[in-house]
Amino acid sequence: MPTSVPRGAPFLLLPPLLMLSAVLAVPVDRAAPPQEDSQATETPDTGLYYHRYLQEVINVLETDGHFREKLQAANAEDIKSGKLSQELDFVSHNVRTKLDELKRQEVSRLRMLLKAKMDAKQEPNLQVDHMNLLKQFEHLDPQNQHTFEARDLELLIQTATRDLAQYDAAHHEEFKRYEMLKEHERRRYLESLGEEQRKEAERKLQEQQRRHREHPKVNVPGSQAQLKEVWEELDGLDPNRFNPKTFFILHDINSDGVLDEQELEALFTKELEKVYDPKNEEDDMREMEEERLRMREHVMKNVDTNQDRLVTLEEFLASTQRKEFGDTGEGWKTVEMSPAYTEEELKRFEEELAAREAELNARAQRLSQETEALGRSQDRLEAQKRELQQAVLQMEQRKQQLQEQSAPPSKPDGQLQFRADTDDAPVPAPAGDQKDVPASEKKVPEQPPELPQLDSQHL
């Protein structure tokens, strides 16, 4: 019989790496009044580049009564295979309209991303086939960019399921590269030191490693010893009265009937605190997060029998009946006891770093040469600018000189003075100006000839 969808888990995909079947699950009890929690926990980001679109689609689908009923009767396989997607044809018009708008917004967002990507890599005038590029986004149907159809929901479910399943592997690969880079830098640092300094640095490193290894025994995650320790130290209960069912209910924080990945990882905190302390120089918090992920994967592998990334009460109780539950041997092997890389992998990584460094150096050299060329060009432009300014100044000065030479002279009071022509008769000076001239030299104006007077009698 297929496993039914767990009730009360509408947002379980949104904690990192959970299946979409958990996301779309809804509470069975319709009579239960909605709980108003003003301080509700914000749903964590899945890390998917379409996380917001996924969250909004889920929120809209939850508002449709028909779809919720079908979800209650569905199983994880129906959801993952896309069978449930066909029920989208029966949702209300209002819900379909909202889904259509969400898809148009997502297509618009992806187009903007593509444009930015192409602008950064290619010539600005290059024509881009956005329709073809949209096909690389597998969580929606690029052939229909305006309406949200059953195919869109099917693609969204399948893509999210696949991407989330690959998330852990990507995290492990990232951690491996982090560890290799750390070792590479450590070796380069030691090579840069003198012999005495190198010996001192190596001694200090060995001392840090020794302190890091000195910690209490770490219990195997999911074992009886590990769960009892949580029961006693975290829950404050009597270890002799350990009850798996009660334990499950206590740590099902959101009371949805399953332990999701975040709820499981919370159980490992006490074990991690035995090994890692943020105050200690020798303890790497990146290693602690890798340790947490490895612990969760171990529990899921041994307890999550249907591999839906959720632990039901039945699965949890069944795991407590196995022999491995009580027999943990020497305990859990931590990260430093299980190297993340081999020497051969480190060698290839260093070759890759060397090639990248050479490429960056060549690029830096080209940029330096271009900068120098630009500097020389700038100097030439500045010199030409100064020459042009000097030429303009000289032209202005010459123009001013020409204007001064062509203008008539002015009297002391600023009035213009015009010169008389030399060929004209001299103009006598005003009377006031002749007072200093000798009387003998003064010219008397000639009198007109006197006409004879006629006698009126002769007329």
From Swiss-Prot:
<dbReference type="GO" id="GO:0005794">
    <property type="term" value="C:Golgi apparatus"/>
</dbReference>
<feature type="binding site">
    <location>
        <position position="304"/>
    </location>
    <ligand>
        <name>Ca(2+) 2</name>
    </ligand>
</feature>
<feature type="binding site">
    <location>
        <position position="308"/>
    </location>
    <ligand>
        <name>Ca(2+) 2</name>
    </ligand>
</feature>
<comment type="subunit">
    <text>Interacts (via GBA motif) with guanine nucleotide-binding protein G(i) alpha subunits GNAI1, GNAI2 and GNAI3 with higher affinity for GNAI1 and GNAI3 than for GNAI2. Preferentially interacts with inactive rather than active GNAI3. Interaction with GNAI3 is inhibited when NUCB1 binds calcium, probably due to a conformational change which renders the GBA motif inaccessible.</text>
</comment>
<feature type="region of interest" description="Disordered">
    <location>
        <begin position="368"/>
        <end position="459"/>
    </location>
</feature>
<feature type="modified residue" description="Phosphoserine">
    <location>
        <position position="456"/>
    </location>
</feature>
<keyword id="KW-0344">Guanine-nucleotide releasing factor</keyword>
<dbReference type="GO" id="GO:0005509">
    <property type="term" value="F:calcium ion binding"/>
</dbReference>
<dbReference type="InterPro" id="IPR018247">
    <property type="entry name" value="EF_Hand_1_Ca_BS"/>
</dbReference>
<feature type="binding site">
    <location>
        <position position="252"/>
    </location>
    <ligand>
        <name>Ca(2+) 1</name>
    </ligand>
</feature>
<feature type="modified residue" description="Phosphoserine">
    <location>
        <position position="85"/>
    </location>
</feature>
<feature type="modified residue" description="Phosphoserine">
    <location>
        <position position="368"/>
    </location>
</feature>
<feature type="binding site">
    <location>
        <position position="256"/>
    </location>
    <ligand>
        <name>Ca(2+) 1</name>
    </ligand>
</feature>
<protein>
    <recommendedName>
        <fullName>Nucleobindin-1</fullName>
    </recommendedName>
</protein>
<dbReference type="GO" id="GO:0001965">
    <property type="term" value="F:G-protein alpha-subunit binding"/>
</dbReference>
<feature type="compositionally biased region" description="Basic and acidic residues">
    <location>
        <begin position="192"/>
        <end position="209"/>
    </location>
</feature>
<feature type="short sequence motif" description="GBA">
    <location>
        <begin position="302"/>
        <end position="332"/>
    </location>
</feature>
<feature type="coiled-coil region">
    <location>
        <begin position="149"/>
        <end position="217"/>
    </location>
</feature>
<comment type="similarity">
    <text>Belongs to the nucleobindin family.</text>
</comment>
<feature type="domain" description="EF-hand 1">
    <location>
        <begin position="239"/>
        <end position="274"/>
    </location>
</feature>
<dbReference type="GO" id="GO:0005793">
    <property type="term" value="C:endoplasmic reticulum-Golgi intermediate compartment"/>
</dbReference>
<feature type="domain" description="EF-hand 2">
    <location>
        <begin position="291"/>
        <end position="326"/>
    </location>
</feature>
<feature type="signal peptide">
    <location>
        <begin position="1"/>
        <end position="25"/>
    </location>
</feature>
<keyword id="KW-0597">Phosphoprotein</keyword>
<dbReference type="InterPro" id="IPR040250">
    <property type="entry name" value="Nucleobindin"/>
</dbReference>
<dbReference type="GO" id="GO:0005576">
    <property type="term" value="C:extracellular region"/>
</dbReference>
<dbReference type="InterPro" id="IPR002048">
    <property type="entry name" value="EF_hand_dom"/>
</dbReference>
<feature type="region of interest" description="Binds to GNAI2 and GNAI3">
    <location>
        <begin position="227"/>
        <end position="320"/>
    </location>
</feature>
<dbReference type="GO" id="GO:0016020">
    <property type="term" value="C:membrane"/>
</dbReference>
<feature type="binding site">
    <location>
        <position position="306"/>
    </location>
    <ligand>
        <name>Ca(2+) 2</name>
    </ligand>
</feature>
<keyword id="KW-0106">Calcium</keyword>
<feature type="DNA-binding region">
    <location>
        <begin position="171"/>
        <end position="217"/>
    </location>
</feature>
<keyword id="KW-0472">Membrane</keyword>
<dbReference type="GO" id="GO:0003677">
    <property type="term" value="F:DNA binding"/>
</dbReference>
<keyword id="KW-0333">Golgi apparatus</keyword>
<keyword id="KW-0732">Signal</keyword>
<feature type="coiled-coil region">
    <location>
        <begin position="340"/>
        <end position="407"/>
    </location>
</feature>
<feature type="compositionally biased region" description="Basic and acidic residues">
    <location>
        <begin position="433"/>
        <end position="445"/>
    </location>
</feature>
<dbReference type="GO" id="GO:0005085">
    <property type="term" value="F:guanyl-nucleotide exchange factor activity"/>
</dbReference>
<keyword id="KW-0964">Secreted</keyword>
<feature type="binding site">
    <location>
        <position position="263"/>
    </location>
    <ligand>
        <name>Ca(2+) 1</name>
    </ligand>
</feature>
<feature type="modified residue" description="Phosphothreonine">
    <location>
        <position position="147"/>
    </location>
</feature>
